[in-house]
Amino acid sequence: MALHDENVVWHAHAVTREDREALHGHKGAVVWFTGLSGSGKSTIAGALEEALHKLGISTWLLDGDNVRHGLCSDLGFSDADRKENIRRVGEVANLMVDAGLVVLTAFISPHRAERQMVRERIGEGRFIEVFVDTPLATCEARDPKGLYKKARAGELRNFTGIDSVYETPESPEVHLDGEQLVTNLVAQLLDLLRQGDIIRS
């Protein structure tokens, strides 16, 4: 810990998370999408956000590529940088949950330890891990950004699923078949959010 930590004290605010949730009419939570590149994380997260918005739910979508344009623009793809990337995203997501939002995150987040770190930061009941399980062959066939082709050609190192490991979730709240229709997957997620009392029926 830094030497100045003892002088940094958390400042509590008069307006609480519960106050903000009451204003929004729903609980704050994180829906954490994890899976290989091309698995469909961003597509499903975007469709879910659209569906939630239509229901009057206050949301925010944190996307893996987007945060690297600003918040994490100084980070690369080493194990240490990936860990820091997820730590920062977890902290931002936690602030947004405190604001009463339903936060959707779409990150490969290949390591269980980092996902567990965010889970512990957010708290049980507010962290919903969604494993988008799509076969590597399907992800490669989709290859929307041409990254698998570059990785296979040796032009891109430390690419998850090719020469960098992806640790599949052991007990995610939701296990989605990434080859199914997005509309069906969104319906499944909405049901889960209702059952978890995150959003109203």
UniProtKB/Swiss-Prot annotation:
EC primary class: transferase
InterPro entries the UniProt entry points to: APS_kinase, P-loop_NTPase
UniProt catalytic activity: adenosine 5'-phosphosulfate + ATP = 3'-phosphoadenylyl sulfate + ADP + H(+)
GO biological process annotation, one example: hydrogen sulfide biosynthetic process
Highest taxon of source: Bacteria
Keyword hit for Acyltransferase: no
Pathway(s) it belongs to: Sulfur metabolism; hydrogen sulfide biosynthesis; sulfite from sulfate: step 2/3
Enzyme Commission number, as recorded: 2.7.1.25
Keywords assigned by UniProt, alphabetized: ATP-binding, Kinase, Nucleotide-binding, Phosphoprotein, Transferase
Residues that hold ATP according to the record: G35, L36, S37, G38, S39, G40, K41, S42
Function: Catalyzes the synthesis of activated sulfate.
Family of the protein in this entry: Belongs to the APS kinase family.
Protein name as catalogued: Adenylyl-sulfate kinase
Species whose genome carries this gene: Citrobacter koseri (strain ATCC BAA-895 / CDC 4225-83 / SGSC4696)
